[in-house]
Design a protein with these regions (language model features):
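Donor nucleotide-sugar binding loop of glycosyltransferases
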Residues: 12-15, 43, 98, 273
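Hydrophobic helical membrane-anchoring modules
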Residues: 180-316
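A conserved acidic beta->alpha catalytic loop
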Residues: 40-49, 95-96
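Cell-envelope/extracellular polymer assembly enzymes that use nucleotide-activated donors
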Residues: 2-4, 35
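Short, well-formed alpha-helical segments that are part of the catalytic scaffolds
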Residues: 12-27
Length: 316
């Protein structure tokens, strides 16, 4: 199979039929075999009923229904596990992404041998102050921290080699950082393609300005996880050991100083009256706790790699 098209959605009943019709026309015109995965992330409208009706008419459609709203990352994770296409394309269900871009994205992955092709909505039809400006700041920070030079990390329209999505774990709110996760996994042939953007024809946006705050926090998390996530003991153990050693040496110096004073006949100064005593004690205690945190982190990672943090009601 050439393509798996993955579409997370939340309350998008008005756009689903039009979206699939455009996808179907594009793939048939380009002679591409394909499947579509709709992931209903806790919709409260008729989205799932529409997906079921489309499935009856078009066997290449598949659907995953979450028991509640878990988020875009969990939706992508659930679909990535089930895709069969050589190239996986993700896109939003709100018709702001153009299905007509699919053939060229597919060609760039197959013929140009890119691991990831990310869409770049250079000209956006969003509110300047609440979306465009924060998005530019966010993307600039993401490029600087991650070392992956994309203009639009938030663009939902992306194409991946099958090996990429099968090799990474998308969790939390990390969907916007899939290219960074992929680069950390060794898939470094990443490029971008300028794609058109249009105002949302139906419904309202499900994202507010708070997503950028979460995005920056996720960026810090990603920086840490990419370096120490697989082996937290490398970070916590090293910092904890260093703090313990500094605290121990400080306490040792205080003890030696006290013995020297006693040898000289100087009495009356208790070690506990010296603030360095409490500093040394605190550093030794914190060092021990950090070391234990690193050990517990190792154990948690080893026992929870396969844990899914979402519940699926139905798969069709």
């Amino acid at each position: 199979m050439n393509l798996s098209i993955v579409i997370p959605l939340l309350n998008e009943e008005e756009s689903l039929e039009e979206l699939f019709t455009r996808i179907d026309n594009v793939c048939k015109t380009s002679n591409l075999s394909y499947e579509v995965w709709f992931i209903d992330d806790g919709s409260t409208d008729l989205s799932w009923s529409i997906i079921e009706n489309l499935k009856v008419q078009h066997p290449q459609i598949h659907g995953i229904k979450f028991s509640k709203n878990y988020g875009k990352s969990q939706a992508l994770h659930a679909a990535f596990e089930r895709t069969n296409g050589d190239v996986i394309i993700t896109m939003d269900a709100d018709l702001q992404d153009f299905p007509e871009e699919i053939p060229e994205l597919y060609r760039m992955v197959i013929e140009d041998n890119y691991d990831i092709v990310s869409g770049w909505k250079k000209k956006r039809f969003d509110n300047v102050m609440t979306k465009n400006v924060p998005s530019k700041l966010f993307n600039a920070a993401a490029r600087k921290v991650s070392g992956v030079y994309l203009h639009d990390f938030n663009c939902g329209l992306k194409a991946y080699k099958k090996q990429v999505v099968k090799s990474i774990d998308v969790y939390g709110d990390m969907h916007r950082y899939i290219p960074v996760l992929a680069a950390n996994a060794g898939f470094r042939r990443i490029t971008e393609k300028e794609v058109p953007h249009q105002a949302r024809p139906y419904g309202t946006s499900k994202f507010g300005t708070e997503r950028f705050v979460r995005g920056f926090l996720d960026l810090v998390t990603l920086w840490f996880v990419s370096r120490f996530g697989g082996r937290p003991m490398h970070f916590f153990g090293a910092v904890g050991t260093l703090m313990f050693i500094v605290g121990f040496l400080s306490a040792f110096w205080l003890g030696v100083s006290k013995l020297i004073d006693v040898a000289r006949g100087i009495y009356g100064h208790l070690i506990t009256n010296n603030p360095w005593f409490f500093i040394a004690l605190t550093m030794m205690l914190m060092g021990t706790l950090l070391f234990i945190a690193g050990f517990l982190g190792e154990m948690i990672i080893r026992t929870n790699r396969e844990h899914k943090n979402y519940n699926i009601d139905e798969v069709i």
